[in-house]
A protein has these predicted regions:
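N-terminal intrinsically disordered/low-complexity leader segments
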Residues: 1-12, 82-83, 204-222
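Alpha-helical DNA-contacting segments of helix-turn-helix folds
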Residues: 61-67
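Hydrophobic alpha-helical connector segments
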Residues: 62, 76-110, 161-165, 220
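Amphipathic alpha-helical packing segments from all-alpha helical-bundle domains
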Residues: 69-72, 124-150, 159-163, 187, ...
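Hydrophobic alpha-helical segments that form the core
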Residues: 93, 100-102, 141, 155-175, ...
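Short secondary-structure transition hinges
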Residues: 102-141, 174, 178, 182-183
Length: 222
């Protein structure tokens, strides 16, 4: 077997494990998923699993990174496809993007279970915070700086502001994913989140910060 073919097979085995684990983690959760189920679904040996991943937790972290990256790319793609007639200022766009993330938190079962529900419990607070930082802090801070430059929000230290806004969004997403009635929770938390964010408006003038839609289907706004 050539080196290139061996490398290709190794990559295929790793991807088979990730795909099988993702299905199981999304359907059953981390705690209820056994490694024997994963290797059976992937049609590989247990030795292959431990060749690529130290343990089930490391495999879970890899799956979670994959799901989080896909959601981030989905949000960026949604912004690129945004209706040109909608408000173009950074602050309104950012707040609408937050509502889009809440929609994903409600509709995407992989994101719900793997990232929002099991993620904090399996990784712990420090690793969870690191994930949020990798997948959102830089972009969020850039948008907040744009909103300040456009004088849409009050000038504030961008570092702590980014962390606080990210924490609000993270908790709102977790609340929605874990609710008994996710659809109702998504509407309610969307209203509360946007009302809090509107308070950051220039001079605290809510009249200058009209609410964004929290449900594109029903058109409900606060």
């Amino acid at each position: 077997m050539t080196r290139s073919r061996r490398t290709e097979q190794t990559a295929d085995t790793r991807q088979a494990l990730i795909s099988a684990a993702r299905r199981r983690f999304a359907e059953q959760g981390f705690a209820a998923t056994g490694t024997e189920e994963i290797v059976a679904d992937a049609q590989v040996t247990r030795g292959a699993l431990y060749h690529h991943f130290r343990d089930k937790a490391e495999l879970f972290r890899t799956v979670m990174e994959q799901v989080a990256t896909e959601v981030a790319e989905q949000l960026v793609a949604g912004e690129l496809a945004r209706d040109a007639e909608l408000p173009s200022d950074a602050w309104t766009q950012l707040r609408q993007g937050f509502q889009s993330l809440l929609d994903i938190s409600t509709a995407d079962s992989d994101f719900q279970r793997i990232v929002l529900i099991d993620g904090p419990a399996v990784l712990g607070n420090q690793a969870w915070d690191a994930l949020v930082e990798r997948h959102g802090y830089r972009l969020l801070s850039e948008w907040l700086e744009r909103a300040m430059a456009e004088e849409r929000i009050d000038p504030l230290p961008v570092g702590p502001l980014t962390r606080l806004v990210a924490a609000l969004l993270s908790e709102a997403s977790i609340y929605t994913a874990g609710a008994a009635d996710p659809d109702t929770a998504r509407i309610e938390i969307g209203i509360v989140l946007d009302r809090l964010l509107r308070g950051l408006g220039r001079g605290g003038d809510l009249a200058e910060q009209p609410p964004v839609s929290v449900d594109s289907g029903s058109g409900r706004t606060p």
